[in-house]
A protein has these predicted regions:
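Conserved AMP-binding/adenylation subdomain of ANL enzymes
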Residues: 278-298, 305-408, 418
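Conserved AMP-binding/adenylate-forming core of the ANL superfamily
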Residues: 84, 108-162, 179-184, 231-235, ...
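ANL superfamily adenylate-forming
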Residues: 24-28, 201-251, 359-410
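Conserved ATP-binding/catalytic segment of the ANL
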Residues: 474-542, 559
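Conserved C-terminal "lid"/linker of ANL adenylate-forming enzymes
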Residues: 565-568, 574, 616-677
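Structural core segment of the AMP-binding/adenylate-forming
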Residues: 2-61, 139, 166-232, 614
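Conserved pre-ATP/AMP-binding loop-to-beta segment of ANL
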Residues: 104-107, 221, 235-259, 266, ...
Length: 677
């Protein structure tokens, strides 16, 4: 064995020991699949569900995804086969009942209560659901009645949601960060009879919002024993009455009105039926049985479940054999990861950015910082070669392997050490960041979806060859096409039917032949992989008529070590500009390393010449990838970040561009775009 091969094999052995890899995930250091450790063997045989589905073995994998020109429209279209239509009586309650029948005494949810982690089996959860559902019936909740729900991601969220679904109610989602005005708008738009909030702080906010809500009859606070009170009332409701209600629910019944984050005076409520969520939930386990039928696999939920993405993932995992851990919050995410050790994770790019920044900050600017920077380049170069050639060269593989025991393995351990499939969605992920994580052995895959598509409508299945910048193929049961103007359009059984009480918005959202127009721009390659290139509403048209997509430019500027956010502007303006915010935690050590006052205020840092020069370097790099007309000619560094608290970011961590422009309109008009004299 050569010295290179011996060194590489030694690194492989260290990597396998650290990752405990299973057969689902081949580590990129080597080409041949390792012998599978006992810990993650496929000893568990896929379990047949009681909801009628074709087993994945019946599918012809070579024909699952078809990409072709639609002869009727001439548009490039790609489709992935999904499950056949569900029975008329299928409901979300069936997902939980089926899990209990298959794995009743095995863990379903594990969550933190005080200082202790509590595990609830599928049978115990179903009993909880039935008890709360009976209580809701006692409260007078009729089939089709709306319940507005304001709660953080928690066991209480899943329990309350499932109970409302069981008795045929309609859950109207409220983010835990929503304002009193937004609460009022959602309660009134949904005609909610009941408002359930998680804690006393939310109750105070709700009390100040509901005076003008004529439909509302009750407000219940979970923190002060609200769910126990509901259960107590439910003891007067018979099993027969509950069963009658459960059996009355059909797949076409409305089950939820999901309000898009950032709703204001005119909220857009997306109507979802039981069929939408059940189709999504049942399609993925059938498509990826090796991952989702292994009982030893786990997932950690921490994204807001008021968002359709996180909620759909919960239903998907309930329909599988995977165990669910619920994080106590973003602040405790790292410690929660060490408990859950998830094999599956659903994240937004902002989370991965934070993980990367924390690792970079910990490495510092000395020798460790040099090693980390070299490891980043090695991982990215590795994935670039894999993307271009299907395989990295021997020297590139060896360089990458050298950093595995000293850098990459630590990064994987931060994420729990067992990750097989991490899906990033909700916003574009910087391709350089994706290449780093994939090259480091962190299996990050991009996906794409919207509230209107019950979240995922495109995804990269486990083991998908690396397609840099692609959000994957059509999700099972979906068809995607690209319109003449580049807009992505979607069709499938999980696409929403309408916006609640908003016929005008509904009509504008669908084409004449029934495809949902997403508002996103993209392209589909010959293999059926979708690439997002921008958003129609974000598309900047300068005063000179140049069309500019801000996303790629923003991604490069945000690679600056201490930049938190970059917002590229210039619509109907003479040139392209950018607003830049600072990540204070990353900024302090950078200032110290440069011999500057690390305790200077953010206002001073925003004006500091060295800080501006560093940002300018990244602006210059971004400009190298675009034409002169698309180049950022001027930028302003702001002394505050765009956050949910100041109303400039949604709960799903997307910057609200119109609100930023409005907030800084004076700054833009007097300093960025000064009129010529």
């Amino acid at each position: 064995m050569s010295v290179i091969n011996s060194f590489t094999q030694h690194t492989i052995n260290l990597t396998r020991k650290a990752l405990r890899l299973g057969s689902d995930f081949v580590h990129p250091v080597h080409d041949d699949t390792p012998d599978e450790p006992d810990y993650l063997s496929n000893a568990d045989v896929p379990v047949e569900t009681n909801i009628a589905l074709p087993h994945s073995d019946d599918w012809d994998d070579g024909h699952l995804t078809v990409t072709d020109i639609d002869p009727a429209t001439g548009l490039l279209t790609t489709s992935t086969e999904g499950n056949p239509p569900l029975d008329e009586g299928t409901s979300i309650y069936d997902l939980y009942a089926d899990r209990a029948e298959r794995m009743g005494d095995e863990p379903l949810y594990t969550y933190k209560s005080g200082n202790d982690w509590v595990t609830v089996t599928a049978n115990e959860f179903l009993a909880d659901v039935r008890a709360v559902a009976k209580g809701l019936i006692h409260y007078g909740l009729k089939k089709g009645d709306a319940v507005a729900f304001m709660c953080r991601t928690s066991y209480d969220w899943d329990l309350t949601d499932a109970a409302i679904m069981a008795c045929g109610g309609v859950l109207a989602t409220i983010y835990d960060t929503d304002s009193a005005e937004q609460i009022r708008n959602i309660v009134n738009n949904s005609d909610a009879r009941l408002l359930i909030v998680q804690d006393t702080d939310m109750r105070k906010k709700a009390d100040g919002a509901v005076e003008e809500c004529p439909s509302l009859e009750h407000i219940i606070t979970i923190e002060t024993g609200g769910l126990d009170e509901i259960k107590a009332y439910g003891t007067t409701v018979s099993d027969e009455e509950l069963h009658e209600r459960i059996d009355s629910v059909k797949k076409t019944d409305l089950c939820s009105i999901v309000y898009t984050s950032g709703s204001t005076a005119a909220p857009k409520g997306v109507e979802m039926t039981h069929e939408h969520y059940c189709q999504t939930a049942l399609n993925l386990p059938a498509y990826m049985p090796d991952l989702l039928h292994d009982k030893r696999n786990t997932i950690l939920l921490f994204l807001p479940q008021a968002h359709s993405f996180a909620r759909a993932i919960n239903y998907i995992v309930v329909s599988s054999n995977v165990r669910i851990y619920i994080a106590t919050g973003i602040k405790t995410l790292i410690s929660d990861l060490q408990v859950a050790k998830p094999t599956l994770m659903i994240v937004v790019p902002r989370v991965l950015e934070k993980v990367y920044n924390a690792a970079s900050q910990k490495a510092g600017h000395g020798p460790k910082g040099v090693v980390f920077a070299s490891a980043v380049v090695a991982a990215q170069n590795y994935m670039k070669e894999v993307s271009a050639n299907g395989k990295a060269g021997a020297l590139t593989r060896t360089r990458r392997a050298a950093f595995d025991p000293i850098v990459y393995s630590s990064l994987r351990e931060v994420l729990g050490g067992r990750a097989k499939w991490i899906v990033a969605g909700g916003a574009p992920l910087d391709p350089e960041l994706l290449a780093f994580f994939r090259g480091a052995g962190v299996p990050v895959y991009e996906g794409y979806g919207l509230t209107e598509t019950t979240a995922p409508c495109a995804f990269n299945p486990l083991g998908t060859p690396f397609h840099a910048g692609s959000v994957g193929i059509a999700f099972p049961g979906f068809s995607l096409r690209i319109a003449e103007d580049g807009e992505i359009q979607v069709k499938g059984r999980a696409v929403f039917p309408r916006y609640h009480k908003n016929d005008e918005a509904t009509e504008l959202s669908f084409t004449e032949d029934g495809w949902y127009a997403t508002g996103d721009l993209g392209r589909i390659d010959n293999d059926g992989f979708l690439y997002i290139t921008g958003r129609k509403k974000d598309l900047i048209i300068t005063a000179g008529g140049k069309n500019v997509s801000p996303g790629p430019i923003e991604e490069v500027i945000q690679r600056c070590e201490f930049v938190s956010q970059a917002l590229v502007l210039g619509d109907k303006r003479p040139f392209i500009s950018a607003l830049v915010t600072l990540d204070e935690k990353s900024l302090r050590p950078w200032l110290a390393a440069k011999g500057l006052d690390e305790n200077m205020s953010l206002e001073d840092a925003a004006r500091n010449a060295a800080v501006r020069a560093e940002v300018q370097q990244w602006v210059n790099q971004a400009n190298e990838g675009v034409s002169r007309a698309e180049s950022v000619r001027k930028f302003i560094i702001l002394p505050e970040e765009f956050t949910q608290e100041n109303g400039l970011m949604t709960a799903s961590m997307k910057v609200i561009r119109p609100k930023v422009i409005k907030r800084y309109s004076t700054l833009l008009n007097t300093q960025m775009y000064t009129k010529r004299k």
